[in-house]
Design a protein with these regions (language model features):
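Hydrophobic transmembrane alpha-helices and immediately adjacent juxtamembrane helices
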Residues: 1-209
């Protein structure tokens, strides 16, 4: 009798979730930001020191009154180093986070919550972009103590900085999804990211090509 009642009872189909899971998205974003903030010496402070070393070495080697497009070489170099910092750190954050979770076999903890593919993408990309921008603020403040600052367009600075951070965060996420081990991430970094960074006009004008 119970079986007959169960069979005769129509199945109830729960409606699909609609709208964005804002709380889940914020939780993922906050988790990723907390992941690199708690080791700020490695993820935030070290890139600032590295950038200042680049500035020091190239200023000593190619400074000495040399100008590029009418600017002292150090003033030409500083914005390029700032943008290079944004690109490299935004890429490194998302790619490293995903490959670590895959190798530690705890990526299921990220995939199981009720987050759509778009929400996962936004969470990872924006957290990577945040790291790139946080490092750039530290680098910019440090460079401002050494190099004269001439801001011609705040809107252009914000547009290109945020756009570059989001672009490289997206590329880092694609790399993290594709990679199966750290060697794969290193391959993309060493053969694509670094060459593009060094040949992008950071250290010399692109008119030299």
């Amino acid at each position: 009798l119970i079986l007959m009642q169960l069979k005769s009872k129509p199945l109830e189909i729960r409606p699909a979730l609609t709208g964005a899971n804002w709380r889940g998205l914020w939780t993922l974003y906050a988790k990723e930001v907390h992941r690199y903030v708690k080791i700020f010496g490695q993820t935030l402070l070290a890139p600032i020191i590295t950038t200042l070393l680049f500035l020091t070495v190239f200023a000593v080697a190619f400074g000495g009154g040399r100008t590029v497009n009418g600017l002292p070489y150090v003033e030409f170099l500083a914005p390029g180093l700032l943008m290079m910092t944004i690109l490299q750190n935004s890429f490194a954050n998302t790619s490293t986070s995903l490959i670590q979770q895959k190798l530690n076999e705890n990526i299921v903890d990220t995939l199981m919550p009720p987050l759509s593919a778009m929400e996962l993408t936004i969470g990872f990309v924006f957290s990577g972009a945040t790291r790139g921008l946080m490092v750039s603020i530290g680098v910019g403040a440090s460079l401002a103590l050494i190099v004269p600052v001439h801001i011609h367009s705040t809107a252009a600075i914000v547009f290109f900085a945020v756009g570059a951070a989001l672009m490289m965060g997206s590329l880092g996420m694609m790399t993290g999804i594709w990679a199966e081990k750290f060697d794969h991430v290193s391959t993309i970094t060493n053969f694509i990211i670094l060459p593009l960074s060094f040949l992008s006009g950071t250290f010399f004008p692109i008119t030299r090509f």
